[in-house]
Amino acid sequence: MTTFTKLSDQDAPSISIHPARRLSKINPNIYAGFTEHMGRCIYGGIYDPGNSLSDENGFRKDVLEALKELNIPVVRYPGGNFMATYHWIDGVGPKEKRPARPELAWLGTETNQFGTDEFLKWCEVLGTEPYFCLNFGTGTLDEALAWVEYCNGTKDTYYANLRRKNGREEPYNVKYWALGNETWGPWQVEQMTKEAYAHKAYQWAKALKLLDPSLILILCGQDGTASWDYYTLKQCLLPAHSPLSTSTVPLIDMHSIHLYTSSPSHLPNVTAPLAAERAIEITSSLIDLARIENGVPPDQHRPTICFDEWNVWDPIRAEGSKGAEESYTLSDALAVAVFLNVFVRKSKDLGMACIAQSVNVISPLMTSKDGITKQTTYWPLYLFSKYMRGWTISVHLSCASYEGETSPKWVRGVKDTPWLDVSATLGEDGYVNVAVVNIHEEKDIRSSIDGPSGTVSVFTVTGERVQACNMNGKEEVAVTESTWEAREQFVFPKHSLTLLRWKLA
């Protein structure tokens, strides 16, 4: 949580850090990823058999190494819009017997050479947990139950035995399952009304939890501010009666929301992620309202928010039908850093956040047949995932604000837009970590900082211009390391992310 006092441009900025005020534990899953059968994310991205850079499984070793550096705790799969016509059974068993299918989300052909077992093996190699999305378009409840049985079944049953036949004796124990993806969208195969979706989601959730009560089920929301979100929460945050007792059990564990932002102008681009902060606040209130109206006991699990698609994406610059291969700038990297600051500030309400996507498709990593490129957006992800963990702590910021146009326009009307965007954490290791984005394109900002003492480690992400880019063989944006003596004021460079880190005395 960051409180804010607005100053004039002539007043001296200040930042006060309060490590003793631990506000909420940060769920490591806010640094989750996403891989979809879209463009070159899977084929030619994480899976590239025959390439000299791939291992015996066909997994790109350079991609694995770069993703391991991000400490990704969970990866969502296999979609996305792709999921609405995907049938998991096509992607298991001998590869020569797997059918190729027309793919309707991105108008391609799905060969099914990479499926459930390959993805789960890849997760084990990466050291991450899987998060599966169920087919709410052309899929059936029987198909969904069979997939859970295939992944998690321990008994002598058909799909558990099919998994064993395919070479995996022990269950995978997949915990996270989404009840569809963007089923409200007109681009979806089998678009649904909120009434139809809520009824279907509740009934599926009952059956899934009967099969495996340990599942963590994620409801399909919109952007957190829509009537869809309120209606589905109200209808689905109803406890179900257990068939074996008189008690009731909650069915929904998280509510999913999505947001992509972009603007060709720097300042609207870097302030746009503040829309995510307002969306989290509104969704949190809708969860509470649904629980109150439904009479949910206060000691029963309160669902958290699963922000399972977020990123900077300009669909004109990077068309989805052409693989959505973005070439990210420093401005985009700073927007990603503001997103991450939002997630740290709102950690109390967040159970997960998945950047879309992990490789090649609107991604911090781009592959070629000869290697990988770490885009500008890789570096804020690296710093936050490495250091911004533990507890969110209280910060008070005093500085001037950006007063221009935002995208969306309503952001400036409901959120403060200070020149410095700040979050702070206290790690399990006793270190205080403060992330500060100076969104100003032209002005370094000198600020006093109340909290640190002695020598402070400084990590900086910046470049000569906001349009600096790491593609085409250039590396114009990376992390630099330095130190700062805390008795002095600190100068935050123009258009930069700075992470300050010191041991709490």
Swiss-Prot record:
Question: Where primarily located?
Answer: secreted
What chemistry does it catalyse, as a reaction equation? Hydrolysis of terminal non-reducing alpha-L-arabinofuranoside residues in alpha-L-arabinosides
**Glycosylation sites noted in the Swiss-Prot or TrEMBL record:** 152, 181, 269
Enzyme's top EC category: hydrolase
Question: Recorded GO terms, molecular function?
Answer: alpha-L-arabinofuranosidase activity
* BP GO annotations: arabinan catabolic process; L-arabinose metabolic process
The entry's keywords:
Carbohydrate metabolism, Glycoprotein, Glycosidase, Hydrolase, Polysaccharide degradation, Secreted, Signal
Family, per entry: Belongs to the glycosyl hydrolase 51 family.
Protein name, UniProt field: Probable alpha-L-arabinofuranosidase C
Q: Which organism is it from?
A: Aspergillus niger (strain ATCC MYA-4892 / CBS 513.88 / FGSC A1513)
